[in-house]
């Protein structure tokens, strides 16, 4: 029998270092002891257990968001109530891509804070950090300000159990959701999970009905549902004209519309995102900064 070769001290030290690093990644971070008193926009950094300030939020003025007036009015009313310390609902903005879901959240936050002394704080939570939400709630619970958590493009795939952490935000578990925290999410899916994932849960669960109900009901835990749908040609052109007027693009109306339609045909779709991309191209061509 061959004797096992002895590891060198250097190799053992390297192995221990890798093990320690792996344990550090698995262990929850120590929470920051204090919340920022200034600033109104942050990103949650779970590996630091703290918030990182965003100096400039890329947002546009509310009047430039066309074809979503009903959604705009509903969301701004809900957000104002929350900012004023009144009851408000968590909101799920779902539907067509590029129709202004995330733009609306940021624009509403900006509008609600206009002229306010105590700003509503917007905190972006990345999709991959959903599992750390209970840590964030623990940090915010003692805060004196009001916090709007925002997750863009939220959905869950097969074998993903982080949706259970989201319930801590929507319902709060045994402690209850802090009164100073609200959660907004955008998603292309109304029920946040693909149908095949729910079908698989039904087939393998001891109690199939309860397994699927748990996942479908995740969307039901949002008190406010706002649907976004593909825009018509008239809506698309209204977006183009509003952008062109706002940024002072000097071009004949007939040419603007014709070129905007050609651009949309080349992209194979009409949406707020496509309209903005056309305006960027046109502004560059005209030598205009926006």
Question: Model segments located where?
Answer:
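Conserved AAA+ ATPase "SRH/arginine-finger" region at the nucleotide-binding site
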Residues: 203-216, 223-237
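Pre-Walker A adenine-sensing motif
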Residues: 70-84
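Conserved catalytic/switch belt of AAA+ P-loop NTPases
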Residues: 113-114, 142, 158-205
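AAA+/P-loop NTPase substrate/partner-engagement loops
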Residues: 111-147, 155-159
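Walker A/P-loop nucleotide-binding motif
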Residues: 85-107
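C-terminal alpha-helical "lid" subdomain
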Residues: 3, 229-290
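Interdomain "pre-motor" coupling segment immediately N-terminal to P-loop NTPase/helicase cores
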Residues: 4-53
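Dynamic helix-loop-helix/coil hinge segments at AAA+ ATPase domain boundaries and subdomain interfaces
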Residues: 10, 50-74
């Amino acid at each position: 029998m061959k004797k096992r070769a002895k590891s060198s001290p250097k190799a053992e030290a390297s192995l221990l270092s890798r093990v320690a690093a792996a344990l550090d990644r698995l262990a929850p971070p120590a929470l920051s002891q204090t919340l920022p008193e200034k600033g109104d926009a942050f990103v949650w950094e779970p590996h630091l257990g703290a918030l990182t300030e965003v100096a400039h939020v890329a947002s546009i003025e509310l009047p430039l968001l066309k074809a979503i007036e009903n959604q705009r009015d509903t969301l701004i009313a809900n957000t104002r109530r929350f900012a004023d310390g009144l009851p408000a609902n968590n909101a799920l903005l779902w539907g067509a891509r590029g129709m202004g879901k995330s733009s609306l959240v940021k624009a509403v936050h900006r509008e609600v804070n206009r002229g306010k002394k105590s700003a509503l704080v917007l905190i972006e939570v990345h999709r991959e950090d959903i599992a750390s939400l209970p840590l964030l709630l623990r940090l915010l619970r003692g805060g004196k300000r009001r916090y709007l958590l925002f997750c863009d493009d939220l959905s869950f795939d097969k074998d993903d159990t982080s949706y259970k952490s989201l319930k801590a935000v929507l319902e709060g578990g045994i402690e209850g959701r802090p009164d100073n925290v609200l959660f907004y999410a955008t998603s292309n899916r109304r029920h946040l999970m693909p149908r095949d994932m729910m079908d698989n849960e039904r087939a393998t669960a001891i109690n199939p009905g309860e397994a699927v109900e748990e996942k479908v009901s995740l969307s039901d835990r949002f008190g406010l549902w706002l649907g976004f749908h593909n825009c018509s040609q008239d809506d698309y052109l209204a977006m183009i004209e509003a952008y062109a007027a706002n940024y002072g693009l000097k071009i004949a109306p007939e040419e603007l519309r014709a070129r905007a339609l050609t651009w949309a045909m080349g992209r194979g779709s009409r949406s707020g995102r496509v309209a903005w991309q056309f305006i960027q191209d046109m502004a560059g061509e005209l030598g205009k900064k926006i």
